[in-house]
Regions:
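Hydrophobic/aromatic side-chain positions at a characteristic register within alpha-helices
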Residues: 2-3
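Boundary/linker segments of alpha-helical solenoid repeat arrays
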Residues: 20-30
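Long, low-complexity, acidic Ser/Pro- and Gly-enriched intrinsically disordered regions
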Residues: 30-124
Length: 124
């Protein structure tokens, strides 16, 4: 999607994927800890996550909207792989973390923009 310049769509699906992976992993620690799945997600986060977040944090208001949209999408769509009610506590914890990330883009907006500018990254 990023190569096709569908950047906002890429950010949205990345955050949906992160949300669902994290509550699956947290709710199934015994299966996931030290697993190949976990290693693959770590590699994905380092490669694709870096690129997606470099773009996403360039427009903090859009990022907040995308986080809200990802949460709403997760809420309104079933998860056949990991039903939400089977990991309700883990899901609540992950949602709280995502909401804290969203809030940090408000609380630390000036600092985020300044750091991006210092690193030669665009603020949109």
């Amino acid at each position: 999607m990023l190569k096709e310049e569908r950047n906002e769509e890429a950010v949205f699906w990345y955050y949906v994927g992160q949300l669902r992976w994290r509550y699956y992993a947290l709710g199934h620690k015994d299966k996931v800890s030290g697993s190949e799945e976990s290693a693959l997600m770590g590699a994905l986060n380092q490669s694709i996550g870096t690129v997606v977040n470099r773009y996403a944090f360039g427009d903090l208001e859009q990022l907040r909207q995308t986080i809200d949209k990802a949460i709403a999408w997760d809420e309104s769509n079933p998860n056949e792989f990991c039903p939400k009610d089977s990991v309700a506590e883990a899901r609540a914890e992950v949602l709280e973390g995502l909401r804290e990330l969203r809030q940090s883009t408000i609380d630390q907006a000036d600092e985020i923009r300044k750091t991006r500018t210092e690193n030669g990254l665009e603020n949109r």
